[in-house]
Amino acid sequence: MTTQQPVAVLGGGSFGTAIANLLAENGHQVRQWMRDPEQAEAIRVNRENPRYLKGIKVRPEVEPVTDLTAALEVSELIFVALPSSALRSVLSPHIERLSGKMLVSLTKGIEAQSFKLMSQILEEIVPQARIGVLSGPNLAREIAEHALTATVVASEDEDLCQQVQAALHGRTFRVYASNDRFGVELGGALKNVYAIIAGMAVALDMGENTKSMLITRALAEMTRFAVSQGANPMTFLGLAGVGDLIVTCSSPKSRNYQVGFALGQGLSLEEAVTRLGEVAEGVNTLKVLKVKAQEVQVYMPLVAGLHAILFEGRTLSQVIEALMRAEPKTDVDFISITGFN
């Protein structure tokens, strides 16, 4: 891949647009595909994505397109920023065009029916593609505004990682590499659940000690579950684990945090989602994660507690009381306590 060869970004949302701008700043011609012709025309004419990144200028090297076939045919590196629900329907008709190309997922989610992550779905759709994921503490608007940011590209394909680093790395955006694709991607999906809990804690003015406890125990739960599924626990000490968890659990810009904050103010889940205007990923992830944790017998008390509040009619005070009465475990799962006297 050279800077003369176009790069494709699939999806017209905030993160896809932020990544498209970064690529353009680094000298790439970018084909940003979106379904909506009106959105594409608005970006083409006004150089702005008013629906998702209002006030951010889209660079002239970014060409918004609605012809997916044309965008895929000219690109070897393709960033996939599609909603999880649209992944199969959009890409399945283009298997031959995608074969052998580099597909990098930007979407943080879990498919409910299969408990598959987005890169696993890409692998299923296009077995001959080269697959990677990009994840980390990456709020789209801050990237677009050139706040200093770091991310992780993860793949078993070292050359893919190097090409993504070369394409995106810039003066305000640093790209690290990992070979733990599953762990990096799982961290990005799981942290959305805990952002809901964090938002509730802030709305209820629970204090800094409480927020710190919640984030730390959330990291323990995420890591415990991920290891049960084959991920490397060390991944969760990096940007895609604790880094993403901190920004999502502490930023009012996070949709999942906003839902939790509304719940903490006394709104129902339906009212909270209505206020947000869209479903927060953490709500759907919570449902499938609760079932999966029970299935594989992984201890996840925060997940169970939030599920009880949102879907089982329990109150927050009841759940907190149960959590605080539970038998204390060891602080860090992966440190032996056999040396205790």
Swiss-Prot record:
Q: Tell me which SUPFAM superfamilies the record gives.
A: 6-phosphogluconate dehydrogenase C-terminal domain-like, NAD(P)-binding Rossmann-fold domains
Question: For this chain's UniProt record, which GO biological process terms are given?
Answer: carbohydrate metabolic process; glycerol-3-phosphate biosynthetic process; glycerol-3-phosphate catabolic process; glycerophospholipid biosynthetic process
Kindly list the positions annotated as binding sn-glycerol 3-phosphate: K108, G136, K191, D244, S254, R255, N256
Q: Which enzyme class?
A: oxidoreductase
Q: Which reaction does it catalyse?
A: sn-glycerol 3-phosphate + NAD(+) = dihydroxyacetone phosphate + NADH + H(+); sn-glycerol 3-phosphate + NADP(+) = dihydroxyacetone phosphate + NADPH + H(+)
Q: In which pathway does it act?
A: Membrane lipid metabolism; glycerophospholipid metabolism
Q: What does UniProt give as GO cellular component? A: cytosol
Chief location category: cytoplasm
**Keyword Signal found:** no
Q: Spell out the InterPro entries in the cross-references.
A: 6-PGluconate_DH-like_C_sf, 6PGD_dom2, G3P_DH_NAD-dep, G3P_DH_NAD-dep_C, G3P_DH_NAD-dep_N, NAD(P)-bd_dom_sf
Give the EC number(s) listed in the UniProt record: 1.1.1.94
Q: Which UniProt keywords apply?
A: Cytoplasm, Lipid biosynthesis, Lipid metabolism, NAD, NADP, Nucleotide-binding, Oxidoreductase, Phospholipid biosynthesis, Phospholipid metabolism
| A GO MF label | glycerol-3-phosphate dehydrogenase [NAD(P)+] activity
Catalytic residue positions: K191 (proton acceptor)
User: Record's Pfam families?
Assistant: NAD_Gly3P_dh_C, NAD_Gly3P_dh_N
Source taxon at top rank: Bacteria
Residues engaged in binding NADPH = S14, F15, R35, K108, A140, R255, V279, E281
Q: According to its UniProt entry, what is the function of this protein?
A: Catalyzes the reduction of the glycolytic intermediate dihydroxyacetone phosphate (DHAP) to sn-glycerol 3-phosphate (G3P), the key precursor for phospholipid synthesis.
Q: Which family does it belong to?
A: Belongs to the NAD-dependent glycerol-3-phosphate dehydrogenase family.
NCBIfam families tied to this protein? PRK00094.1-2, PRK00094.1-4, PRK00094.2-4
State the protein's name: Glycerol-3-phosphate dehydrogenase [NAD(P)+]
The species this protein was found in: Pseudomonas syringae pv. tomato (strain ATCC BAA-871 / DC3000)
Q: Which gene encodes it?
A: gpsA
